[in-house]
Amino acid sequence: MTPDQPLRVVIADDQASVREGLVLLLGGLPGIDVVGAAADGEQALALVAEHQPDAILLDLHMPVLDGIGATRRLAAEHPGVAIVVLTTYADDGSVIEALQAGARSYLTKDADRTEIAQALRTAAKATGSALAWPA
């Protein structure tokens, strides 16, 4: 991603209304291009392999492959893709597990679209195991 290119993002959430809402909210922001939306971790991995996004916005609790499992695989298979968790779970254990699995940022679903967009941008700019929390 260069400064003049939009941030390419995949969204993964098992709740259709949340997933579709995030596509509309983030896709309407300048500088963000939502390139795919998945209902589970396996679909998310396939979309990341297909589209090579800069970042993925990922829920923790999804069917087939949950967010932690998807985060571990994404971090191993696509280390250049920034992983940002967006979930309803704010407990320390969930935060620590997600960050240890490879997430660069962790937000709860009460974050507004500006906070989510900033977390995605900050995480995409981070390198290595740098963490952006909160963004």
Predicted regions mapped to residue ranges:
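Conserved sequence signature across two-component system core domains
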Residues: 12-13, 38, 56
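Active-site residues of response regulator receiver
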Residues: 13, 59, 87
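The feature encodes the CheY-like receiver
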Residues: 18, 58, 63
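Short hydrophobic/Thr-rich beta-strand motif most characteristic of the beta2 strand and flanking loop
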Residues: 31-39, 47
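Acidic catalytic/metal-coordinating carboxylates
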Residues: 40-43, 64-69
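Short amphipathic alpha-helix used as the core "switch/output" element in two-component signaling
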Residues: 46, 68-80
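Active-site beta3 strand of CheY-like receiver
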Residues: 51-57
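Short, flexible helix-to-coil linker/hinge segments that flank and couple to helix-turn-helix
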Residues: 93-100, 104-135
